[in-house]
Amino acid sequence: MKRERLLPLIVATALFIENMDSTAIATSLPAIALDFGVEPVALKLALTTYMLALAVFIPVSGWVADRFGARPTFMVAIGVFLLGSIGCASADSLGALVAARFLQGMGGAMMVPVGRLVILRSIAKAQLVRALSWLTVPALLGPMMGPPLGGLITTYGNWRYIFLINIPMGLLGIFLAWRHIPLLLSEPKPLDVRGFLLSAIGLALTMFGFASLGRHLVSTELAAGCLLAGIAGLALYVLHARRHPHPL
């Protein structure tokens, strides 16, 4: 298979399992809540935690790929996502599920941007549009298949299998990445640690504030306080980035 087809399909494997998992869990929330003995609204914390992990770790994904290489970073990202999936499938409490979803988010935060970086750096510009089309179509199938698949599994099986079906596809993605994705190792710029912390805190608090307002995850006062603190953190990051020679 040609390179401009193979690489996008490998990356699309990771995007597929991430997008499918994110949408499939939504239809299983009542069943999960029943197993854990909590209100379904409390499980929105598991959804929010995943988004928080994405917001925190996506900004640093490019630096990690430059520092350690695109291939190992992509493979480890899928592995971390699979570990989170196993944690979700074996969770026996809301706290365990939230922690596992955060681990999934860490892996997902590296999979998506690093995978696209591989395509941009490995394929000639003349073939780039065609390559991205091979990436987009399979990746879009995940959100389409997620809800009906999640409902089917929850109705006729157990909601835990929603996370376990990620394992064979993820292992396939790791194998294909090991065989075909180039290393793409380059000399990274110094990591902007302060910028990373400011952006992580700002994005996490802002997203948590928006996600919590009106959803009864926490009190309205706490949600509003997180939102304001997050906006302040992002403002501090902008000021910091303007002065830093190598901003995040």
Regions found by a protein language model. Give the residues of each.
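Hydrophobic core positions of alpha-helical segments in small-molecule transporters
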Residues: 25, 45-49, 76, 99-100, ...
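Extracytoplasmic
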Residues: 3-61, 111, 146
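Helix-loop-helix hairpins in multi-pass membrane proteins, especially solute transporters
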Residues: 58-195
